[in-house]
Regions:
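Disordered, acidic Ser/Thr/Pro-rich linker "stalks" and the adjacent N-terminal cap
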Residues: 540-614, 623-632, 651-660, 690-694
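Catalytic cores of carbohydrate-active enzymes
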Residues: 44-49, 53-66, 70-74, 80-85, ...
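Non-catalytic carbohydrate-binding regions of carbohydrate-active enzymes
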Residues: 162, 257-295, 329-499
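Substrate-binding groove/exosite segments of carbohydrate-active enzymes
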Residues: 48, 53-187, 290, 304-321, ...
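Bacterial Sec-dependent signal peptides at the C-terminal "C-region" and cleavage site
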Residues: 37-44
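Trp- and acidic/polar-enriched beta-sheet ligand-binding modules for extracellular glycan
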Residues: 602-603, 629-694
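Acidic/His metal-coordination segments adjacent to aromatic residues that form catalytic metal sites
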Residues: 108-111, 141-150, 212-235, 298-300, ...
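Active-site acid/base region of carbohydrate-active enzymes
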Residues: 77-98, 115-118, 122-123, 157, ...
């Protein structure tokens, strides 16, 4: 065992010396490890059955995912199911803005506090980018970052860590040109946060509501326990960790651009802010990072510490401000304690010992349902942040107050939260005693205010992207785990990384994947590293050009209802429903209806788009929802307007698949309007989730 381990170490070092080409890596393997590879024929390269998996998970909509998402497999079916569900959530929250490209939304339907007319919010953006960076189709993350920085989408509606997310995305794709185009805007936005910087204390402060966490300890106590929706300005671990990470990202991007002065300036800011967080926001008494009050009133006093621990205290680990320093490691005990932050069903945002723990202050006026609060409920938002921080802590050093087995347990607990009565549907917040949703309003279904797939890829599987031509593989599973519910195997396949495809297989005994026992890493299908047991591997990854991002722009998208393009229909003429047919949003979740719905009694219906000017079109995408009273049409035809008449686009007839997007191509046509003529299935109506015309 030791001899073979030593040969593997020599193999890895030899690969590291091999240079920058994939051929050199393969040559190093053959030369450095003859006893490892020559003793017996090499096992075949394992491959997950892509089409079978995607058909099982997504049915008719499998095509959207086929060349986009990395595959995942493990001995835990709940982790598997939630992993694929979260990509479905990602797909549902992609809103096409037409010429501005794609963004990720937080809510599927509209809410009153979103940024109009885009339906964007910036508080969960870092999660959206962290998930989207792992797609082989780089357009979604790229468009979103361009919107945020080049189109003013980062309006500081809430506190944010978007520059840090851009750096995390760069580590995966190494597209320096795209990243550096955003650098001036990153610096500008960072400077705007001076309006929340106390120069005497050297720290940022924020109102909890604008930290996307209303009804926290600071805001409730600042009201004397009477409210907490507004107020409670405080120096918080959240905004200071965000700004630390954003400054570090800007410093690194500036260095990449060769701007040494800016790199040094922001590096100095990083060190100053880190020092102030460690000096001022760490509480020896509470053994935790805490808020200090900015506000001073009859109930609380400036610079005093808040009186209870909150989950937000783990954010210095989430954003790399600290790693495995022993002084702070005891804080992790609080999420393991059932009477502290470790609730039976999930991580509490505040401890039960707090006087106003789980007291309900706010209700929805229309329904009387409970509204959002952060005084104890489980929030997937902060659960994601804490698990990211825990992954960073465990990757930085050996187990201490908390270990790798805890990461797997907490990830599994979080995965279980995605289920409602056996059905996958992540909502806003949950009761930590029961695991049941609290808010439960229509807007809450399939809520994209958190991450999960990044926790699987970079945390559980341990794919740590690097700034150089390498990748660190360090799965967060305990070595020599013999527990009954251990993860006996897992795989991630076709992960885009530095222009290549990275795959990782772990099989405890080699039986499941019928190949190598232990951990194996493949680059573009070739084995580049392995070891017989779990542990860290540093693998060279010679960079390759990324595929060019293709950006077709749908000319049918309508963001403002009163502007062109404008929809009309033969029935179902409610303005909101009509607009949903061309608003750039496509999803097939039945809990939240989306799209134009026919209401006519006859089988033949139509939906038309008036562009208000001549446009040239060559392609269409049609997305039909099926379920309940709705079915995909029996057939359809596309027509275009010419000389005041509707004329057929030839050969465009067929039976589209339900709950999927179908592409239709045709010879270029110049027109001012297009009409979709539908023959409905007997006894059913049609819901057109979206028609896009290119």
């Amino acid at each position: 065992m030791l001899a073979r381990s030593g040969r593997r170490t020599s193999l890895i070092r030899a690969i590291g010396r091999a240079g920058s080409s994939l051929r050199a890596v393969r040559t190093a393997m053959l030369c450095a490890a003859p006893l490892l590879l020559a003793a017996a024929p090499s096992p075949p390269t394992p491959r997950l059955a892509r089409d079978t998996i995607l058909q099982h998970r997504y049915g008719n909509d499998a095509d959207w995912y086929r060349d986009r998402i990395p595959l995942f497999d493990s001995s835990d079916e709940t982790l598997n199911a939630v992993y694929y569900y979260r990509w479905q959530v990602f797909r549902a929250h992609q809103r096409d803005l037409g010429a501005k490209g794609y963004i990720s939304t937080e809510f599927l339907n509209d809410v009153g506090w979103q940024r109009e007319p885009y339906a964007s919010l910036n508080d969960a953006t870092a999660f959206h980018i962290a998930e989207g960076r792992w797609l082989r189709d780089r357009r979604f993350a790229d468009d979103y970052l361009r919107f945020l920085y080049l189109d003013g989408g980062n309006d500081r509606h809430f506190s944010e860590a978007i520059a840090d997310a851009a750096w995390g995305r760069y580590l995966v794709d190494h597209d320096s040109q795209a990243a550096l185009a955003l650098l001036p805007a990153m610096r500008h936005v960072y400077g705007l946060w001076d309006d929340r910087f106390d120069f005497t204390k050297g720290l940022y402060w924020i109102e909890p509501l604008l930290d996307a966490t209303e009804y926290t300890v600071s805001s409730i106590d600042a009201s004397g326990g009477k409210d907490g929706f507004r107020g409670g300005d405080a120096f918080r671990p959240s905004i200071n960790s965000y700004q630390y990470a954003n400054a570090l990202a800007i410093s690194r991007f500036a260095a990449l651009a060769g701007d040494r002065a800016t790199a040094a300036d922001y590096a100095a800011r990083v060190e100053r802010l880190r020092g102030r967080v460690l000096d001022a926001l760490w509480s020896d008494r509470q053994d935790h990072f805490i808020d200090r009050y900015k506000v001073d009133d009859q109930y609380v006093h400036y610079w005093d510490q808040i009186r209870a621990r909150e989950l937000v205290g783990y954010l210095p680990w989430t954003f790399g401000l600290i790693g495995a320093e022993p002084k702070y490691d005891g804080a992790w005990k609080h999420i393991l304690a059932a009477d502290q932050l470790g609730g039976p069903a999930g991580l509490r945002t505040t401890e039960p010992s707090y006087q106003y723990y789980m007291r309900q202050y706010r209700y929805d006026a229309a329904t009387g349902s409970r509204e959002c609060q952060w005084n104890g409920p489980i929030w997937p938002f902060q659960t994601t942040q804490v698990l990211t921080g825990l992954a960073n802590r465990l990757h930085a050093g050996p187990d201490g107050a908390i270990g790798r087995g805890d990461y797997l347990r907490l990830l599994r607990q979080y995965a279980g939260m995605h289920y409602q009565g056996g059905k996958l549907d992540l909502e806003e917040d949950y009761d930590p005693a029961t695991g049941k949703p609290i808010v439960g309003l229509p807007r809450s279904h399939h809520y994209f205010h958190s991450g999960f797939d990044d926790l699987v890829i970079s945390g559980l599987a341990g794919i740590e992207p690097q700034a150089d031509d390498s990748v660190v593989i360090d799965p967060l599973l305990p070595v020599n785990d013999r527990s009954r519910d251990r993860l006996r195997w897992f795989a991630v396949q076709d992960v885009p990384y530095h222009g290549r495809l990275l795959s990782l297989f772990y099989d405890a005994d080699g039986r499941h994947y019928r190949g190598r026992a232990g951990l194996s890493v493949y680059l573009d299908g070739a084995l580049v590293a392995s070891r017989a047991e779990l542990g860290k591997l540093v693998v060279p990854v010679p960079a390759a050009p990324n595929p060019v991002i293709v950006r077709p722009s749908a000319q049918s998208i309508s963001l403002v209802r009163s502007d062109y393009p404008r929809p009309t229909a033969s029935s179902g003429t409610d303005p909101e429903r009509l607009h949903q047919g061309i608003d750039g949003r496509v999803w097939f979740m039945p809990e939240l209806p989306n799209g134009w719905e026919s209401t006519g009694a006859t089988r033949d219906e139509w939906f038309a788009v008036d562009f208000g000017k001549p446009v040239t079109l060559t392609r269409a995408e049609l997305s039909f929802f099926a379920g309940g009273a709705f079915a995909a049409p029996d057939s359809y035809a596309l027509e275009y307007q010419a000389d005041g008449q509707w004329r057929p686009l030839p050969t465009q007839r067929g039976a589209p698949r339900a709950n999927a997007t179908a592409a239709v191509t045709f010879q270029p046509v110049r027109t001012t309007a297009v009409r979709l003529v539908i023959r409905k299935a007997p006894g059913a109506q049609v819901r057109l989730a979206e028609i896009k015309l290119f």
